[in-house]
């Protein structure tokens, strides 16, 4: 016997003119929670990946376009947290080692990407993250080369895995080799991807190591600007015009503005903190663009590339530092 009762339609709601399912609200709730300090960058990426794998990501929203805009805003905001005088001073410390390690990593990464037959943009993002400052570099370079969310997610996942490992093994290696505070701080700043892991590893080693690592890491992070422009040039394809990442220009302007208008320091600090949280939201959105099926399709090549680059820069910089840095 068939029932004459009408079937219950799923609850829906409107968002910017789009008809969304009530189940999609979980996606927005977690996105908002990413603004709180209780969720770290790796956790945000994993949450996005988990929702995507279980089909809880709204399909009617252009999440990729929103992510690109939010990434630009967050990178610009981070510029207000960098002091120009500190940036200039940091650039003079270990300049040769910083420049050499960055370009070695990018060039070696290019050859390895070719050898492994890995997607060019994914390989370049992993190399950029290894060469400069992990997730922040990947977030800045990705829109400059018009990388897809799955390419960005694979690069971020690779870097975050290696970051977690570095946090534990670097201090152990430093103590085993009886490295000085200054030498270890230099090594951590050169060979560890993300600033958070650099600070964590160096802080565990000692106060002097932390000061050295923070200063050199800042100088390394400043290379986000030229590398983003270089990346846009390399991946312009058949287009005659280069896709200039204008947010990088505003990032530089934010640094300069904060320097010449110091009276607004309290506001800058709030903008900087808010931008860091917005970056976490972006990582959640990026994670929502990749599923288990996409990871299986990519295979182990992205992780293998990340490990090979990391070992090369880690061993190479360690050898140089042990021979030349007191």
From Swiss-Prot:
Q: Does the keyword Oxidoreductase apply?
A: no
Cite the entry's keywords alphabetically.
Answer: Cell membrane, Membrane, Transmembrane, Transmembrane helix
User: What kind of membrane protein is this, topologically?
Assistant: Multi-pass membrane protein
Q: Where in the cell is it found?
A: Cell membrane
Q: Which domain of life is it from?
A: Bacteria
Where would you say this protein principally sits, based on its record? membrane
Name the residues that span the membrane: 27-49, 70-89, 94-116, 123-145, 155-177, 184-206, 216-235, 242-261, 271-290, 303-325
Sorted alphabetically, the Gene Ontology cellular component annotations on this record are:
plasma membrane
The UniProt entry, under InterPro entries, shows:
UPF0324_pro
Similarity section? Belongs to the UPF0324 family.
> Record's PANTHER family?
INNER MEMBRANE PROTEIN YEIH-RELATED, UPF0324 MEMBRANE PROTEIN FN0533
Query: What's the name of the protein?
Result: UPF0324 membrane protein PBPRB0970
Q: What is the organism field in this record?
A: Photobacterium profundum (strain SS9)
């Amino acid at each position: 016997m068939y029932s004459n009762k009408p079937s219950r339609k799923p609850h829906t709601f409107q968002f910017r003119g789009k008809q969304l399912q009530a189940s999609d609200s979980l996606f927005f709730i977690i996105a908002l929670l990413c603004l709180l300090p209780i969720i770290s960058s790796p956790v945000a990426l994993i949450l996005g990946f988990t929702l995507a794998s279980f089909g809880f990501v709204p399909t009617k929203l252009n999440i990729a376009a929103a992510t690109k805009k939010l990434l630009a805003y967050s990178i610009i905001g981070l510029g207000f947290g960098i002091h120009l005088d500190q940036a200039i001073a940091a650039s003079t410390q270990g300049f040769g080692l910083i420049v050499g390690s960055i370009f070695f990593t990018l060039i070696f990464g290019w050859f390895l990407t070719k050898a492994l037959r890995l997607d060019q943009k994914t390989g370049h993002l992993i190399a950029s993250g290894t060469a400069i400052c992990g997730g922040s570099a990947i977030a800045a370079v990705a829109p400059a080369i018009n990388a897809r969310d799955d390419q960005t997610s694979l690069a971020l996942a690779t870097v975050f895995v290696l970051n977690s490992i570095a946090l534990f093994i670097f201090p152990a290696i430093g103590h085993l080799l009886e490295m000085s505070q200054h030498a270890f701080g230099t090594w951590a700043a050169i060979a560890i991807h993300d600033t958070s892991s650099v600070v964590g590893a160096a802080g565990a080693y000692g106060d002097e190591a932390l000061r050295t690592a923070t200063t050199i890491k800042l100088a390394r992070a400043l290379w986000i600007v030229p590398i983003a422009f270089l990346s846009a040039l390399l991946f312009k394809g058949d287009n005659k015009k280069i896709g200039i990442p204008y947010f990088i220009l505003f990032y530089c302007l934010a640094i300069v503005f904060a320097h010449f208008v110091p009276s607004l320091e309290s506001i800058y600090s709030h903008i900087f903190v808010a931008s860091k949280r917005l970056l976490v939201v972006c990582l959640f959105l990026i994670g929502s663009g990749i599923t288990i099926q996409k990871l299986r399709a990519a295979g182990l090549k992205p992780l293998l590339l990340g490990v090979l680059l990391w070992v090369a820069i880690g061993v190479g910089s360690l050898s140089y530092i042990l021979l030349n840095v007191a």
